[in-house]
Amino acid sequence: MVNRFNRLTSKEWLPFQKSWFKYESDTKLYSDNLRFFCKAEPSEEKVLYFGRNFDLVSSIGKELKIDVTTEDQYDGPLQFALIDLRETIQGIKDLSEYIVLRDQVISLLGKVYRHMIHRRFVCILMPNLQLENQYLPLAWDMAMQISSMYSLKDEKIGCLNLQDENQVESTRKDVFYSLYFRKDENSTGIYSPHVHNLLNSAQDKKIESQRELTNHVPAWFILKPAPRKKNEILHPAKYPEELVLMFIEKFTDKDANILDPMSGTGSTQVASLKSGRNAYGTELSSYFAEIATKRCSELIDPQAPELFANKVANNFVILNKDARLISSADFPEIDYMITSPPYWDMLNMKGAENQAKRIEKGLQTNYSESDDDLGNISDYNYFLNDLIEVYFNLLNCMKPGSFLTIVVKNIKKKGRNYPFAWDLASGLMQKVHILPEVFWCQDDINLAPYGYGNTFVSNTFHQYCLTFQKPN
C-alpha cells in the first residue's frame, strides 16, 4: 500500500500509533509529530506553531524541509497546526486565566480553519492541572470545546519518566495529553460552547480528605498481569487483580468493605480477600456470578488447602443482581468501590479483531444477551446516562468521604471518537469530587497498522483509572 499521508515507512508508522509514549525530549516530541503529520514530499503548505518553543520547532522544520510559521506570519494553506500549551498551563494560577487562554486558542483555530488542508490535523499538547486541593481537567475541557470546530480524532498520553517511582504526586507534571483534531467532512470550523460539569463543579468543591492518600498512586503505570486462568478467559473483558490490589491498598485499610457492582468473574473480590478486606458485589450474568462465587469460596474454604498459602478469614457476598437495583440493605456500608463498566456496546462489534479471535476459540464475546445489560444499549447517550444513574444510586451504599475508582477508556466507533471517560467524569461530578486521573498503560499488545497511508488512528493501549470522592 502506498503511503500518501506522510514521509514514514511502514516500520516507522507503527510506533507512533501507540496511544501512550514515554516522553524523552521536546525535540523528539516535535520531530515525531512533524514527520507523521506532514506530507511525504516537500510542500509549500506550511505548519502553524503556537507555543513557547518556536525556534526549536523551526529548526526541526528546516531539517525536514518543512516551513514552520506563527499565528502572526502565516498565509496560504496549512498542512498541520501544532499548539503547545504545556508551559503556559503549568503557570496558570486560577480558572479565569485558563478561560482567557482557551478563548485565545479557539479564536486562533477559527481563523486558520479555512487555511487548513482538508483532512489534515491539529495537535494540542497540554496537561490537566492541580491547583491546591482542586483538580481541573483542562485538557478534557479543551478537547470538548475544540471538537465543535474540528473533528476530535484521537489522543495520546505523554508519560514522563520519574527519577524515583516512590515519590510520585499524581498527575501534576507526570503526564500530558496530545490531542488530535482533523478538518474533515464532519467539521465546520464554527465554535459552539460545549456544556459540561468538568470545570463548574471544580470551582466550589474541594477534596475533603488528606492528600497523601493519592500522592502514592502513580500518574501512570505499566502492568503485566499474570496469564488468565481457564474460567477467567471465559469473560470477554476481565481486568487484572494486580490493578485492583494496587488501588485498594492505597485507599483502604485491612477489613475494609470493598464493592464491585459489575463483578464479572470476581477479580475485585479475589484481590480484596487476598489483601485482608471484605468483598462484596453484584453480577447480572448468573453464569459469571457463579464463577466469581466459586473463586471466592476457594479462598475462604479451599478444597485443596495445600494449594493455598493462607486461608482467607474475611467475608464475601456476590449477588446475581442488576447493578441498577442495588440498595443499602444488600451489603454493609462500603469503604471503597472499584469497578470497570461495559465500554458501551463495543463487545457487540462483530468485526473487532479481538472478537474474531474469541469466536474462533468458541468463547463468549459479550457479557450477556439480556435487555437489562448496559453493554447492549445501542444509543451512546442512553447508555451513559443509565451508567451515571447506577453510580449515583451506589453512593447511597458508601460511607461519607469514601472513594470510588472506575476503570474506563475513550471509545472509537465507526470513525468517530466518543470521549467516554471524560463524559462519565463530567456526569459524576454533579455529586462527587474528582481526583487526578491515573493511566494504566498496556505494553504487551501487538500494534495494528490502522489507517496506514491515509490518516492517523491510534491503537488504544491506555485506560483511565478515574477516582472520585463522595462528599462528607
Where are these regions (language model features)?
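Class I S-adenosyl-L-methionine-dependent methyltransferase catalytic core
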Residues: 1-472
